[in-house]
Every structure is written in structure tokens, then in C-alpha cells.
Amino acid sequence: MLQSRKRPIQQVSGAGGKRRRMANRAPNMYFQQNNMFAAKDLSHGRHKPWSALGAWFMGPKAENGDLFQDLVTKTIDSHIKFRRHIYFPCDPPYVTDDLREAEAYQASKDKLQTELELLQRQMQNSVPFYSTRYKGHVNWDIAMPANLGYICALLYNQNNCAAEASTVTTSFELEVGTDLCVMMGYEKDKSMGHLVTGGTIANIEAIWAARNVKFFPLALQRALKKEEKLAAAKDYKVFFPRRGKMGELTGGSEWELLNLDTSSILSMPDDIEMQTGLEHGEFMDVMSDYLYESIGAPEFARRHPLIEKTCVVVPSTAHISFTKAVAVLGLGKNNLVKVAVDDDSRMNSGVLKDILDKHLEDKIPIVAVVAVMGTTEESSIDPLSEILQLRKSYSKKGLDFAIHADGAWGGYFCSMLRDQPQSHYLKPPEDSGFIPRIFLSNYVNEQLSAVNQCDTITIDPHKSGFCPYPAGALCYKDKRMNTFLQITTNVVYYHGDMTLGDIGLEGSKPGAAAAAVRLANRVIGLNKNGYGRILSECNYTAKLLYCLWVTLPEEDDNFIIETTKPLPEKWKNLSQEEQKRLIKDRIIGKSNEELAKDEEAMEYLKEIGPDTLVPCFTVNLKDNKSVDVCNAINMAIFQKLSHSSGERTAHRVPMVVTASSMLHHKHSSALKSFKKRLGLDHKDDNPVKFIITTCMDPWASSIEFFDDLAAIMRNTILCAIGTVKDPKSNHDFISTGVVDDENRVIVYYAGNFSNASKQYGTVATLKFNSQKQAKEYKEKQDALLKTSTEPQPIVFRSKANTTLHDVLFGESEYGDDSEKFDCFVGLPTDQSKPFMSVNMKVLDVPQFEHFDDEEHPEFSSFFMYGNEKSAFLFHIPTKKPDFLQIVQLDDIPKGVGTEDDPDLLLKHGIEVQIPDLSGSPTIIAGTPSDPLKKLKYHATFVGIDGVEMKTTVKIDRKIYFDGTTINY
């Protein structure tokens, strides 16, 4: 049974008192006092460097909406001007005034407006990636420069497949490719990069290029032996790593030719063309009878039997795109070799070494070893520096391979390593400013510093580059590697005009994507004070959130939390428990200024937690060994905090997360170790589900923000445990007695502190499925009102014996998207008989909280909910003793809406406090008494834009009060 107790409330610096209870009502993360800029920081007459972020995004509340709207309008005006007055201004118009007056034109225009308005309404239920509440996938708000660049170029609809179809945006893509290569540490003149629709395409292309490079020496050897046109190069020599010296290519064994180093192979076409005097196209025409990509896999394998089991090596955490790559390229899914990961979900270099030993012994060629620079689930960066060392040592043994870095997620973190160019408009900062930023851990720094030694790198501007889809990219250390794709045999695009359709998988692709990335790069900058600043502030948020999850459970809770990446076993001789104490004492609840001054705490933050912004965790019950129960709890958390295709609107999801599962791998101890930490049975191979909380939010830097996330997550965990473990029961909902024109009625749950099934505070809207039943209900309610001004309320009791969660959110056992209720006058007893039974649909659940306090609040708190016709207050119970109460207000209080939507907050539901009433109930004869002695009270609440509001509530009718039922 879950006992009533308090939620973890952090101390606000300097406040000295506990925060008021929050849960998922009107969170303080939007209080106006939480300014991004402190007054003292702006008083110097210049912005600190971190203030630039304010101009890079529209803002979670569209704070830069006016600026964005103005720039979009100017962008559209510029395009209209181009069409009208710049491009052949003497051309006559087609859409004339007469045409616009035609009925068909007007009908089409009206249809356009109607459908667009419908689309706009539908899109408002989309996932709110831009919100500080969003902690799900590796996706967040789009940088304003990127959005504006996309919109500007979109109007011109350029196709970057061919230069003549995209004269401007092709050059943009070339510029972007170069900039990304430089950010990754490649030499500007030797490297190349280009955009693709996403990381999947980039990864496939990288393996495609690596495979073709791997097999090229075999084809060339055969051609040198057979082709008269290549006779002048018959004695062509290459360096054989295993021999440690030069030798004739024609004299190399098949195994030796499959293990030449990449740079030697990339030089072969140029060398042979120089020795033979052939043009590149002529040489490739000769080679077409020998290349894998020309003659096909069966014939090439017949000629070169060793290639039959050629494989690609990836960590077990690798993206599914590599499975697609080996399938599409004909290598076969069975030849995708997965390396086990360690307890930090990083590729285990010891296991990789064993695999390399086995492949060397069995003479199985390896096309490439893939290092993931930031998994999007576990947030881990593979030990690239060790992988590079292994290649160096195994090359000398006769086993060589390309190395591809999948930096789709983590690639942009290299911006944190790059200094700001002196020509940039922002001067280098004198100090770090008000908002702290956490740079890369020593381990991550080492790995990202080594990516410039990889042959290819995938990087996605539409992930950590905050650009719109589709915008992935692939960078080549040596631009010559791209020509081995052999898409065209006639042109080598080393510089000058490039037909981008000839350098990758894709043909048509939007020039708008290139414009978006280019403008973002130019405005923000691919350096420490551009993207590096954004990501370092996000890193600060991620480390704090990691600390929050580590310390969220309290000693007397019945649940534990384990992060997928554990705390260090030791840090400066501190045990894990001592580290948790350090987190609680010196990190959680501290202001940005306090943390920035605590060098040891900041050093600790830098080294712990996720490699790349994604803290993950699993919740389990104490003493629970069942993986199924653990997974069910975490699935319930995910379902509560995620969007679905159902009817639940976006504002009913107080925080958005996602989830995945840690899977078994025969050579990995990661799952077993994770199960041990969770107290689960680790003898089987069943996967364990975990919650993913991605931190791509540079705004999340206030104490209040983390308090609110803690409250939301804690309530979600308790409700999820209840979903799985609550004993089944019938549930009573007290009616407000008011049915609107659409047959909807608001109800209040009759919770109980002592009954594990009913330890909830809940308000919901139900809808009668039948007009007849709604009419019968209203007639009964009217009859009751005629007998008394405060009659017993009508109570809906669920007929199904189930959990409260399943009544409100589960699939109906009746199969008609509704629940069945019996209707009683007053709370039913064992002797009560229902006066009718109804089928009702649960339309809205604005409040669903598990009791979790051991102290009453300072002031009495109510949940205000309703619509423009009826407003109600529902008392929020906290701890025993307390009471249940419903009152109807005589009017909508001021401050709960806007001019366009006067009942906005009322429809959402908000917590209000009445300062004149103590949060502790008045006890008379051992029972709480009704505190509402007057008809009018002052009330406070968090209003629109986080402004603290004061209003007056006037009571029209007291519907229900009970100080007994909830306590016994």
C-alpha cells in the first residue's frame, strides 16, 4: 500500500521555506520572476554572451513572435517583389481582376481558407517540441535563422539535384558541407560534405563508399593483369601494412588487397590515370568490367571468394540504419556484427578486440567499424580513441578497415571544441555570464577530439543543429572517397560547380534545407560561443536533471530509481551514497550563481551523467524482483507522459518523455548489471524498459523549473505504481449537478487516505452517451434542488471493478469507448440502490494526482475548473485529516482568460489558493469542518505567462462538503 507522504520539495536559495505543492498544476517554471537575464547583468550596458540565445529561437512562449512574424513578412514581401518587379517585369499578369471575381475563383479561395484553418486547428494537437516541458526524442525548437532560411528558399522551390535547377542553393549546400567538415576537424581543402534527408541516408552512403573502397584493389589487380590499356601501370606499387613495405599490387594476395589502408586505395585512380595517361572517364570505363558495383555481388564473389562473408562492425546500440545499410548493399543482415556494450552503454573495446582477433584468424574482411558519437537512447559515446588505436595495431597485423563515426546526434558537440573566429560579430566573452554551461567531460572531449581521424562522419543539423527536417549530412575526410560510389564515370567534382544528384543516394532534394542550415551556421556559428554555447547550456540542464532523477526517491518511499548510466563507484574517494549527499547538499536547489562559484560541484557535474544530453532511468518497487512488474510501471509512466493518436490534448501531458528497452547481448554484462542495481531477477534475458528524458532546452536553468519537473515526475511515478499495483475497486465520482448543452458533467473523485485504491485527488468531465439518460439525470437533479438548497449530490459509481486509472484512461471493457456507472443520491453504502445506470465517456481529466504530502499547505488550495458558463472550486486534499468540497462560483473570476478566450485557464484547470484560509483544516469534534463561512474570498493563482494573479471568487452554491469519508 502507498502511504500518504510528502513529495520532495527543494529549498529555494534564500527562501528558507518549503515550496508549495505543485504536481501537474500551473507550474512555477513560467513565473515571471524567472527572467533569463538578471538586472545586475544588464546594467553594464551590454548583453552577456549567453544573451545571444534569446535571438536564436522564437521562444517556448513565442516571446520573439513579433520579430519572427516581421522577418517572415519581409521574406514573403521580398519574394513577391521579385516575382512582380525584378524577374521580367513587363510580362503580363495571368491572375487578373476579372479572374479573381469569378465564382470558381472565389469558391477555390474560400476552400483554401477553410482547409487551412482546419489544418491550423489540427496542428495545435501536435507534439510541442519547442516547450521546456518536452524531454522526449532528440528534437526541440527550430532555430529562428534556420526556419527563416527554409521559408525564404522554400518560396523559390529549388531542387538541389542539379546545379541548373538550384544555382544558388547548390552553392549553399557546398558551403554547408565545408563548414561542417571544418567543425569536425577535417582539413578544409581535402574534405567534403553534403546534405541528405537524414542520418539513415548518410549512414547507408558511408557504408556504401567504404565497401566500394574495400573491394577496389581486387578489381584493379585483375584489370592490371588483363587490360592492355593499363599496361603502363602493370608494375604499380602500393604499401602493404602487414609487410611494412611497398610491393607490386599485382603480387598481393587477395587477403592483403582487402586490408590495404584507405588512403592508399583512394590514391589509386589518380596514380593509374597518371601512369597510363587515361582520363578519369576512360579509366573507369575500363574498370567497369571488374568493379563490384558494376558486375554485381555473385560474379564478384565468384572471382574473389574471400569477400563472401564481408561484414560491418557496429555497437549493439547502433541505429537501425546500419541494418538497412547491409541489407540494401547486399552484404546481408547476418554480416552486421554487433559489439557488446559496457555498463555505460559504450562499445566494449575488449569485446571488439576479440572480434578483430577472430576475423583476422578466419580471414573475414571488415568493411568498417562504426563508432556512435552519441546514441539517441542511451546518450553514450563510443571509445573512438581506443578504436582508432586498434585499427592502427591490427593494420600492421594485416587487418584493416574504415572507421565511420555516426555523429547524427553528437556531431554538433564538436562545436564546443572550436574557437570563435575573430571576424565573428560577437566578441569573445570576458566571463561565462549568469547562465552556467557545462563543457564536455574529459572522456567525451577525448573522443570528439579524435573524430577527425575517421574516414566518414554522419551529422544531422536537424537534431543538435536545431534545423528543420530534412537536414542530415555526411562528411568525408578525403573527398576522393565519394567518387568511389561510381554514380558517374565522367566527372570528378573536386571543386567548382557540382551536380549534387551525382554524389549520393538521393536525386531530388530541397534547396531550402541547405539555405536553412547555412543561415543558422552564419548567424549562430559552429564554435564555442555559437552552437557550442547552446549545447553547453543544454549539457548543464542534462547534468542537473540526471542529479534530480538520482536523488528523487526518499528513504521511506516504496520505489527506487536507477539511471542507465550509474554514478561513478568512487569520485574523489566518495562512495555513491556520499555522492548523492553531495548532490542534495551542493547541487539540487542551488541557484546558477551559487553553483557557478562551487568549482568542485561544477567539476563533478561535468564528469557524471549522460555523455550527450539524455538522462535515462528506470523505476522499480523496493523488493520487487519481477521484470514484468517493473516494465509495466515504466510503461505506465511513458503512457502518462507521451502523446498518442488518441483524443488527449497536448495540454493534458504536463511533461513529454519517451522510452526504450535495454536488451540482452550475449557478450555484454550491461543488462545484468542494470537488473542487479534495480533489484530485479537477472537470471533471464528479458529486456528492461527505461524512460528517456532528452535535454535540448537551453532555457531550463531555474531552481523552480527543476522543482516542477520533480513534482510532475514524482506524481507520475506514484500514479504509475497505482496503475499496476492498486487493488481493484469500484470508484465514486461526485457530480456538480450541472449538465451542459452537450450532455457533459464535471465530477470530483471521492478519494480516501486509508484505501490504497483511492488515494487520489481527481477532477474529470464525463459525457452521457444517451440524450435520454442525460435528460433523466437532469430531471432527478432538478427534483433534488426543489427539496433543498444544498441537497445530497448525485454520485456516479463505476460498475467495473478496476483501478481508477483504468476507469479514466483505460480501454473500456464494454467495447464502446465508454464506462458504465450506477447513479446514487449521496455516497452509496452497502444498502444503497441506484436510481439509474448510465453509459458515459471520459472526455477530460484535468487533475489526476496521487496523495503524497505529510504536511498541510500554508493556505487552503482549490482546483478551479469549468467553462464560460459554469465555474467550480474543488478542494485539494493533502493529508489526513482533510476534507472533500465542491462549490459553484457565481461568475468567472477575473484573470483566467484573454480577450479572445475569456475562460482559457478555466478550461485547462488551475490551482488557486485562498490566503484568508489556513491550509490546515479546522477540527470540530474530531472532524474537519467547512472553512467557507463567507460568500466572497480573495484568491491567488499563476496566470497567463506565469504572472502571479490576484482575483476574487464569489460562491453561488455549495454543492458538497464531507470531512468524514476521505479520512476513514
Predicted segments, located by residue:
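Active-site-adjacent bridging/hinge elements
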Residues: I142-L155, E173-K188, V328-G330, L360-P365, ...
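Positively charged, lysine/arginine-rich intrinsically disordered segments
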Residues: R5-R7, K18-R21
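Active-site C-terminal subdomain of aminotransferase-like
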Residues: S379, M416, P428-L613, F617-D628, ...
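Nucleic-acid-interacting cores, centered on viral/eukaryotic replication and modification enzymes
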Residues: V313, A318, L329, K358, ...
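Short, conserved secondary-structure transition motifs
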Residues: G374-E377, H404-L417, S661-S668, F733-Y748
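Conserved PLP-enzyme active-site core in the AAT-like
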Residues: G198, A202, A209-R480
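Glycine- and acidic
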Residues: L154-E164, E187-L195, H304-K309, N334-V341, ...
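N-terminal entrance/gating region of PLP-dependent enzymes' catalytic architecture
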Residues: N24-S191, I201, K214-D235, F239-M284, ...
